[in-house]
Structure formats: structure tokens, C-alpha cells
Amino acid sequence: MSNLLTVHQNLPALPVDATSDEVRKNLMDMFRDRQAFSEHTWKMLLSVCRSWAAWCKLNNRKWFPAEPEDVRDYLLYLQARGLAVKTIQQHLGQLNMLHRRSGLPRPSDSNAVSLVMRRIRKENVDAGERAKQALAFERTDFDQVRSLMENSDRCQDIRNLAFLGIAYNTLLRIAEIARIRVKDISRTDGGRMLIHIGRTKTLVSTAGVEKALSLGVTKLVERWISVSGVADDPNNYLFCRVRKNGVAAPSATSQLSTRALEGIFEATHRLIYGAKDDSGQRYLAWSGHSARVGAARDMARAGVSIPEIMQAGGWTNVNIVMNYIRNLDSETGAMVRLLEDGD
């Protein structure tokens, strides 16, 4: 019998005696039932584990279970590489999840790790790091894109406009939009389309959630359905690839990748503003989160409450929403109103 435990082909084998029977079982259960996690979460977990395991091998450390002092050194290594605080926190978060799901204490529960994260945040802020967010795709942007593309007869333009309309209207994540099938669409008495979403990143329920489309966005989606032929099979995904000859390729088995949907945002931004510069910086064009950010900001401007915004976007963390809308009141904050009142 081998004295090594392999949990994944891309991760180093573990000595069996390094953990208890219960921890080993929990760890194997987690990798066996990986479909319980979103595709994005699982990819990030594996990416972090590979990075962490490679660092451990290079520095003669044990990758699992992780020692707090080793995690501390790893986080400082990430900082030295120039990674942003948010990225470093994501690495720690995935290591936390790995240990918690295995029935072990989270590395961040240790004093060594929690203190070094405070240190990293302080040092990075003092060095001039500022939190970045996806470039917002707001109502004015959507209206501009629609005015440019709504009269186009190109199948790709019709698809892209319908996708952007749904993304902004519903605040769904692009992976959630990719999973929409024709059979998930129904009609309200007022003629609006109603999309049934079986699961989201924060909601897994047989009841799902319903997202109503405005009449304007409904027309954009109707046009796409008409020219694409996706309605021929109710099991077809709503959005599909468009061949080089300009003809849609409906499919009930192959959904558009999130990268392809990201590309729609990027291509649309390029259409309006031209190519990105060569600085290599992120968020210089619209991305998969842009519509969610833009819609949240537009709702905040319109006086929609934070709980309502969170419900619309499926957010469970208020800090995420506050980060999206953080600069909206820069010219209308309480002290500005107080000082300028009567001027």
C-alpha cells in the first residue's frame, strides 16, 4: 500500500501520515465533489494551490497542512513580486477554504498570518496602491452602443447587443448568462421577457430566481432569437458562437465560454474608444464585471437603497457594493452640501 496520497494530478502527493484519517477523507471528498463549487472558484483554488505548492517545493516546506509561518512567508513573497493586496487576499482566501473544508484551522486564524496581512495592506497603501475595479458599463454607455449597433444586420452585432442588454438589465455574471437556455425564457402579461436562473454564484435553489427584461432589451433579445435560430430547440443555449461566414451556430451542448463573452465587452469598447494602450494595466476596457458595476452605480445615483442594489446583483457582501459606488458622492457628499448651502 502506498504511503502517499494524491488528491489531484497537478498537485504534489501528500504523505499519508501527515494528516488524520478524517482530514484525508474531508480533503478527498472536496476534490471528488468539485462540481459543488463554481467553475471560477474551482479554477482559482487549483491555481492558488499550484502556486503555493510550487513555492513550498522550492523552499523545502510542506504544502499541506500549511504551517502559519510558511503561509506568512508565502504572502510576503507574493508582495515582493508586486501583487496587489486584493490578489494576495485571494491567495489566502483559497488556502483558508482548503483547510476549512478539510476540517483544519484556517491559516488566517493564526496571529502570524493575520498580522502580516495587516502589514502588507499598510505597506502597499503607503506605497501608493489604490484599489481598482472593473471599468463601469453604465446606462449612457449602453445607450451609445445601442445607437451604434441596433440598425446593423450583422448576426454578431445583433448577438452582442442582446448580450450587453441582458448583462446590464439583469446584473447577472457572465457565467450565469452563458448558462441561459431558450426554455428558461417566458413572458409576462406586459410582454416583457422573464428569464429563469436556476443558480447563481450566491444562490443554489430549485426555485431559482426570475429576471425580468425591459421592453427595450426584450426587443433586442427577440431579434437575436429570430436571426440566430436558437429557438428551434428549447434546450439550445440562448447565446452561441457566430461562424466566420456570419451564421449563428446554435447548440444545446456547448455554451459560449466566459472568455468569449468577455471578448464581447472588449470588442465593444474597442469599437467606441479604439484599442487599449500598451501599458498592460487591467481594466482599461470593459470586462465581464463592467455591467454589474455600471448598473450598481446607476441605481445608487437614482436613489436605490443599498439592500435593493445587493438583491438585484445577488451580492451578499455590502463592502463589494460600497466599493463599486465609492466615488459617486465625491461632489455631493454631506460636508460639501453643508459648506455650499446658501453659497
Curated annotation (Swiss-Prot):
Gene3D superfamilies: 1.10.150.130, Intergrase catalytic core. InterPro entries: CB (IPR044068), DNA_brk_join_enz (IPR011010), Integrase-like_cat_sf (IPR013762), Integrase_catalytic (IPR002104), Integrase_recombinase_N (IPR010998), Phage_Integrase-like_Recomb (IPR052925). CDD domains: INT_Cre_C. The active site is at residues 173, 289, 292, 315, 324. The keyword Glycoprotein does not apply. One of its GO terms (molecular function) is DNA binding. Residues 130-338 form the Tyr recombinase domain. Residues 18-103 form the Core-binding (CB) domain. Keywords: DNA integration, DNA recombination, DNA-binding. One of its GO terms (biological process) is DNA integration. Belongs to the 'phage' integrase family. Catalyzes site-specific recombination between two 34-base-pair LOXP sites. Its role is to maintain the phage genome as a monomeric unit-copy plasmid in the lysogenic state. Homotetramer when bound to DNA. PANTHER family: DNA ADENINE METHYLTRANSFERASE, PHAGE_INTEGRASE DOMAIN-CONTAINING PROTEIN. This is Recombinase cre. It comes from Escherichia phage P1. The gene is cre.
